[in-house]
Amino acid sequence: MVRFAHTVFAMPFALIGFFLGIKAAGGFDWLLLLEVVLCMVFARNTAMGFNRWLDRDIDAMNPRTSSREIPAGKISPRNAMIFIVVNIILFIATTFFINRLVFYLSPIALAVVMFYSYTKRFTPLCHFVLGCGLALAPIGAYLAVTGEFAVLPVVYSLMVLTWVSGFDVIYSLQDADFDSGKGLHSIPQWLGIKGALRLSAAVHVLTALLVFVAGYLQGAGLMFAIGSGIFCVLLARQHSIVKADDLSKVNVAFGTFNGVASCVFAAFDIVDILFGNANFI
């Protein structure tokens, strides 16, 4: 029901936020790192579990998703809801041991990631709500360490928002006809496949600009430049392999390219945060 492989989209940026916080506040804490990782897992479980539970009837009608666990009868709706509630409790309980601000904000974070599942019922901007949910990763991890807001992690969050929204538009191309037939909303259903691809590309141009802004504010060095270069190349590459008349590589663009891009970027960026000392951007 929950694809842990998709955690690679947000988890690397949570780690970036964590190490930005460490650099700002000082003092590495293994227990705090574990708590941040657990929060990411519990939030992901809640969001994805709730999406599967809420969309179970829709998924049953869609040939692409009819084999998912709930419509296929492998997991009952009741057991899925128990899984969701347990992860909500674990998420909030874990934030209690981090700091007061994160604990107080935890219900809001859960509300955002769960609200996404409703949005395709009434707005084609649902992809941007998903982006907002994953964008909580870097700022949330930063708050876990420092207990206060700052501009740089917010820029990273905006970067995640645009990046995720753009590739989710590409992913949803597969369901454009189904969405139209069932009265569901998405960018492809609204703008058509060609229009959706153009919008996704424009949003990813904004992502690339935000990468540059983050590097500038961070006083980033060579490692960041290498990581961000690879990230942007992979970002562009996914747009070159998905065509309006050929959607066969959507899953490669969605999963492989973006998963590799986030992990590579985070690895280089974290090294730069911890050990870089010469401005490059």
Describe the residue ranges of each PLM region:
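Intramembrane alpha-helical segments
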Residues: M1, L38, R68-V155, A236-K243, ...
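Multi-pass membrane catalytic core of lipid/isoprenoid biosynthesis enzymes
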Residues: V8, L34-M40, R56-S106, G181-A225
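Helix-loop junctions at the membrane-solvent interface of multi-pass transporters
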Residues: K23, F96-I98, T119, L143-A144, ...
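Extended hydrophobic alpha-helices typical of membrane-associated regions
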Residues: L206-L209, V213-I281
